[in-house]
Amino acid sequence: MKRILTLWAAMGMVYVALEVLFRGRSHPSMLIVGGLCGVLVGAINQIPRFYRAPVVLQAVIGALIVLVVEFVSGCVLNLWLGLNVWDYSNQPGNVLGQICPAFALLWFFIMPLAIWAEDTARWLIWAYDSAVYGRGGKPPDTPYSLKSVYGDFFHGR
């Protein structure tokens, strides 16, 4: 549980920082929502069935995860509590102003970055943790590169 909460906090902080960088502002709730998305997206390649799944498939699943979390949290934060954290009602194809096709596509293309960031955070935090790699087990010397993830993404690997 401690590992999940650590990743949740790390990924939430990364999300808030990116939102401030690109939007100029964020909301405290985005620490929770962004962290949840990071943990759930990171969980994709923790499932044995997806260990070697193509990055494109992981990106599709990840984008769907983010859309579901965004929709549910948007309904709670924006519609129910009236916090007005975001509003996509002026976007074509929006659903209750909480999600829209344009941002779904954006999440799809951002997903390789999210996958890489979560895997890199795991590597940085637990690189030499024997509980993760077993007694005497050794992690890779460095995490894989963001360039290689996008290379696999655009080549369908």
Model-derived features: where do they sit?
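Aromatic-rich, lipid-facing transmembrane alpha helices and their immediate juxtamembrane interface loops
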Residues: 1-157
